[in-house]
Amino acid sequence: DVLVEQYLPQTFWIEGQVPEDFEENNLDIGIDIFKSFGYEDEEKVCTIDVPVKVRNVVLNPLDESKFFLDLWQHPSCLARMYKVELWSDIHFEIVDNYLKELASLGEKVATVIVSDYPWAGQSCYKVYKNPSNLYEYNMVSVSKGLDGKIKCNFESMDRYISIADKYKMAKEIDLFGLLGNWCAGEFGNPVEGYKDPIRVRYFDEKDKVFKFINNTNDLKEYIGLVLNHLIECGLWDRVRIIADEPNNPEVVKECIEFINSTVGTHQVKYKSATHDQNFLDRAKDEIDDMSINLKLTIQNYKDIESLKKKINDKGGILTWFVCCFPEKPNSFLSSPFVENRIIGWYTYYFGLDGFLRWDYNLWTEDPWKDSSYKF
């Protein structure tokens, strides 16, 4: 129900689907208007006839759409939300349900997390209004053998990718946690001498305790194991190493050289969600796929076409995104639905390939009580 004040015009949204075999040029919709007062019977006031012009175009189902929808998934959060063991069979049943729904919307990317806390829990440790655990954990089970060598169990990562493949939503496989990790200063960086705060927890079989990789030799060995596993699985052409909102092009270039050294002659493809003009100007040659926030999209509107051509010519995708800003348009709980509706229209207007959003299924501690976070 909507409260409509007297004498004020009221808009309302009506959504439906025209059958594919509809052959007419026009469709007439009749909208019946009723009124009632208190406990009186409803009374029909009028019928509003709305003529609709029907274009001779059949849209593909969303899961077959060329629109590049890139909503980042948070599988660890699902285990917490439903109070099940991380990477257990029941956890993957829940993951399956969520990915099936996401795929029906036209999702094109599988989020694969290969280190611990790449976003440092979205700084949830600083939020007191609605305290929530928003940490994401490594899909790879890591250990160090008695011989001092790093070992990896890829079962959970492979299983996640397999589910995404089942629903045809892994056109791209984005690896989070290897580049552009957050909060090196306040959340810490365990790897001595490495400028990107990669946090990889492992079980030391010799000391029988959990530790974090703290040197570049072990880090290089670990990254090499992850990337070579994906190469051996025949997935390499779909893999991107993604950096979320990097702002230091020198550090990114240095880390890219380090990562490249772990896979020999294989070409590594990189992607960034970019919100920094300096990074956009100075690092776009190193990036194969890119998403730029709405502010940068508008600021660089005159150059968008050439940037898109540069990215597309490398076989990449150029999208745009919103995050915790701007206030409008966005997809907050408080955002009017029409702001979500215009995402596709904006994408068409800007001439971009699609849209990115970072917070699919990132539930607060008790979403039934308060599903809003920070805002």
Ranges and model annotations:
Residues D1-W13:
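Surface-exposed binding patches on compact interaction domains or structured appendages
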Residues L8, V18, K314-I317:
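N-terminal functional module detector in eukaryotic proteins
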Residues P9, E24-N26:
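Coil-to-beta-strand transition motifs
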Residues Q17-E20, L27-F37, C46-T265, A273-K284, ...:
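Aromatic-lined carbohydrate-binding surfaces of glycoside hydrolases
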Residues E42-K44:
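Residue-level signal for glycine
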Residues L230-A243, V251-F375:
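Substrate-binding groove of N-acetylhexosamine-processing glycoside hydrolases
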